[in-house]
């Protein structure tokens, strides 16, 4: 079973979704199926078929979440140190073309959210950052073309 890195925050969000799907969503769907069954003929009962589809999707996601929770390697980022970028690092960098400052934390694939400044460890930017330090410059090939960034700060929080 292959482990994958995850922050405590990301792990808690996974467990929270799993609990919600098991304890709230599953009973709601079961009740919707029972209610739709009470309407009679199941062959032409759209409510029944919709509820069964919702059940299938929910159970699939529960199985996926259980697998992710079992394989997660939770890494407490606040205990990490060093002057090189690795999983969990929060990196401040400057786009050398636009002078725009960007701040990203490198996190696991399941918890990445660019809008919140969390990028996946397997993303092109993170792969370019790993192993680098303050003052280094990276080149990232993105869909919009190649971009250069200077790393100006690195911390583990």
Swiss-Prot record:
A Pfam family recorded for this sequence: GreA_GreB
GO MF annotation list: DNA binding; RNA polymerase binding
Assigned keywords, A-Z: DNA-binding, Transcription, Transcription regulation
Record flagged with keyword tRNA processing: no
Gene Ontology terms: biological process: DNA-templated transcription elongation; regulation of DNA-templated transcription elongation
NCBIfam families: greA, PRK00226.1-2, PRK00226.1-4, PRK00226.1-5
Record family assignment: Belongs to the GreA/GreB family.
Function statement: Necessary for efficient RNA polymerase transcription elongation past template-encoded arresting sites. The arresting sites in DNA have the property of trapping a certain fraction of elongating RNA polymerases that pass through, resulting in locked ternary complexes. Cleavage of the nascent transcript by cleavage factors such as GreA or GreB allows the resumption of elongation from the new 3'terminus. GreA releases sequences of 2 to 3 nucleotides.
Protein name per its UniProtKB record: Transcription elongation factor GreA
Organism of this sequence: Brucella canis (strain ATCC 23365 / NCTC 10854 / RM-666)
């Amino acid at each position: 079973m292959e482990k994958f890195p995850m922050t405590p925050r990301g792990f808690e969000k996974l467990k929270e979704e799993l609990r919600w799907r098991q304890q709230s969503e599953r009973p709601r769907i079961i009740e919707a199926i029972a209610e739709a069954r009470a309407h009679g003929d199941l062959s032409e009962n759209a409510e029944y078929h919709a509820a069964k589809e919702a059940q299938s999707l929910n159970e699939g996601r529960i199985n996926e979440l259980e697998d992710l929770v079992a394989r997660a390697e939770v890494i407490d980022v606040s205990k990490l140190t060093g002057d090189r970028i690795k999983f969990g690092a929060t990196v401040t960098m400057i786009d050398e073309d636009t002078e725009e400052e960007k701040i990203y934390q490198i996190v696991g694939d399941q918890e990445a959210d660019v809008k919140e400044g969390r990028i996946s460890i397997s993303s092109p930017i993170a792969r370019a950052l790993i192993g680098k330090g303050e003052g280094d410059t990276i080149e990232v090939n993105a869909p919009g073309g190649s971009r250069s960034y200077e790393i100006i700060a690195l911390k583990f929080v």
